[in-house]
């Protein structure tokens, strides 16, 4: 098993030696079963001829020129197995124990590198991501600038079109106002002339009515005077007739009254004589009875 593993490890893969690994006395008999169980797992021995498709899915290979980055990708990992094995054998380990430690160390390092590769971001990935982010940001900025320029140009064209429309509308409004002003002036003049003609006609009619009224008043006044004189003449005739009647009736009435008075006087005298005779007869009768 160890010989096969050793043959599988080529010298070309071990160009870079792992520094800073302290070798302690390890019970190899405890580590050998663990190393044998790890041999069943997938090994990540990276070499110059390793294809990227053989690596685990989800891992991105970034070939960078930086030698002192903290985490290298699995494809750039090189383990100097010969120097490591020679160092262990110089420390007193046998060849099998050294090969077991080599295998276990290789497994631990590979697992740690895979864990770091899955959980941490390498400097190259970070640089690529930052570069992609800066590129996307610059593209977004340029697109935003272009969009803003397009918007500004569209706004300017819309503003110019609006200005032209406003100017045309202003010109149309001025034309309509001038037309309305002219029409209103003409209408006002026509109305003024019509009103003047109507006033003249009304004045002529008023004068005509005044003349007719004056003539009618003259006729009415003459008729009134005529009727007044007729009434005066009628009243004078009535007064004269009444006066003549009085002149004729008063003497006749006075004569009738004088005659009535004379008759009354005679009747009075006759009555007083009869009363005296009755009084004398009464006194005679009374005396006879007594």
Swiss-Prot record:
Subcellular location: Mitochondrion membrane
PANTHER family, A to Z: MOZ PROTEIN REPRESENTS A CHROMATIN-ASSOCIATED ACETYLTRANSFERASE, PROTEIN FMP32, MITOCHONDRIAL
GO biological process, one term: regulation of proline metabolic process
Domain of life: Eukaryota
Disulfide bond residue pairs: none
GO cellular component, one term: mitochondrion
Organismal lineage: Eukaryota, Fungi, Dikarya, Ascomycota, Taphrinomycotina
Transmembrane segments annotated in the record for this chain: 236-256
Species, as recorded: Schizosaccharomyces pombe (strain 972 / ATCC 24843)
Coiled coil segments of this chain: 161-216
Name of the protein in question: Uncharacterized protein C27B12.07
Membrane-topology descriptor: Single-pass membrane protein
Keywords: Coiled coil, Membrane, Mitochondrion, Transmembrane, Transmembrane helix
């Amino acid at each position: 098993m160890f010989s096969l593993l050793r043959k599988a490890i080529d010298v070309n893969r071990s160009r870079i030696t792992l520094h800073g690994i302290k070798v302690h006395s390890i019970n190899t008999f405890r580590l050998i079963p663990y190393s044998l169980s790890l041999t069943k797992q997938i090994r990540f021995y990276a070499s110059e001829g390793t294809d990227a498709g053989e690596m685990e899915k989800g891992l991105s290979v970034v070939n960078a020129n930086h030698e002192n980055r903290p985490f290298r990708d699995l494809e750039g990992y090189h383990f100097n197995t010969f120097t490591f094995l020679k160092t262990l054998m110089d420390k007193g380990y046998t060849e099998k124990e050294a090969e077991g430690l080599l295998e276990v160390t290789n497994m631990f390092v590979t697992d740690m590198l895979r864990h770091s590769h899955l959980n941490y971001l390498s400097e190259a990935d970070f640089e690529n991501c930052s570069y992609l982010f800066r590129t996307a940001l610059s593209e977004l900025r340029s697109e935003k600038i272009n969009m803003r320029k397009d918007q500004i140009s569209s706004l300017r064209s819309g503003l110019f079109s609006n200005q032209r429309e406003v100017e045309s509308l202003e010109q149309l409004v001025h034309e309509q106002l001038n037309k309305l002003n002219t029409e209103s002036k003409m209408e006002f003049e026509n109305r003024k002339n019509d009103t003047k003609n109507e006033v003249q006609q009304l004045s002529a009619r008023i004068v005509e009515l005044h003349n007719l009224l004056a003539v009618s008043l003259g006729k009415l006044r003459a008729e009134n005077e005529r009727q007044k004189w007729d009434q005066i003449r009628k009243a004078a005739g009535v007064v004269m007739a009444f006066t003549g009647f009085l002149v004729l009736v008063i003497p006749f009435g006075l004569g009738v009254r004088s005659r009535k008075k004379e008759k009354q006087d005679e009747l009075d005298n006759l009555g007083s004589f009869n009363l005296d005779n009755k009084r004398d007869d009464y006194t005679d009768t009374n005396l006879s009875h007594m």
